Amino acid sequence: MQSAAWGTKIVDASKVFKPPGSGPFPVALILHGCGGKTPFLEAYAQTAVEAGYAAIVVDSFKPRGISTLNAKLFVCTGTTLHGVKRAADLFAVLAWLETQAWADAHRVFLAGWSHGGWAIMDAYASGENAARATGLPDADPRRLRTQVKGALLVYPYAGYPGLTTRQGWGGQGPRVFSVLAGKDQVVGWKHPSRALERLTRDGLSVDTLFHADATHAFDDDRANDPRARYRPDLFDQTRTYFGRALTETLDAL
């Protein structure tokens, strides 16, 4: 399947938010974690709308026939749909955006939580091998360079078999904002820190908000991991940080 067709399937399963008016609007793509699309991400979508963006809360599972149970059993355990394969969704939605009059397809901001952050990182790290790595025959790494202006990585998975720490992004990429949790019992903070340090060494601009007392999924009041502790105060801080990242990205253009 070609990018635009897969992008249509992805967006048909996803939820789109828009500011008032006809646009074209810059667009924030919001990628869920391994447990699937959950309601708390819609609060981040609203933050994007308040910053003047349209937002798409991307559902990567429904078009693939992955149920919530199977996501927990197989995606969260790393058995299926590694980040580099899910990265196909990014290339596809970027292609789809170019067909939408309401979207400014060349002012895109990517935001990923946990597994969604992994997908963003592997999309960049796959480089010129994007088509082979993602399985999307026309996946074009130039889309990332020309259409995406900023990225937010929230407690991203960055261990094996993630590509960023080992390969980097080829010294090319948008400004990166990140949120790490000091008591993250799922992805930790050391592996994500190493990946971000690699990007910094490669010359990218990287900014980090570190919540020392936060667990994984601290911003999700319905987290599927019983070890997660919901922190509404840190959720608010992270939404504010996201809003600042969105605004600064537009202001820098």
Write out the residue ranges for each language-model feature.
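N-terminal cap/lid segment of alpha/beta-hydrolase-fold proteins
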Residues: 1-23
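Cap/lid segment of the alpha/beta-hydrolase catalytic domain
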Residues: 35, 39, 61-84, 217-223
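Primarily recognizes the serine-hydrolase "nucleophile elbow" in alpha/beta-hydrolase
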Residues: 88-171
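Short beta-strand/loop motif that positions the catalytic acidic residue
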Residues: 172, 178-180, 184
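Acidic beta-to-alpha connecting loop that harbors the catalytic carboxylate
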Residues: 182-185, 213-215
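C-terminal catalytic histidine-bearing segment of alpha/beta-hydrolase fold enzymes
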Residues: 204-253
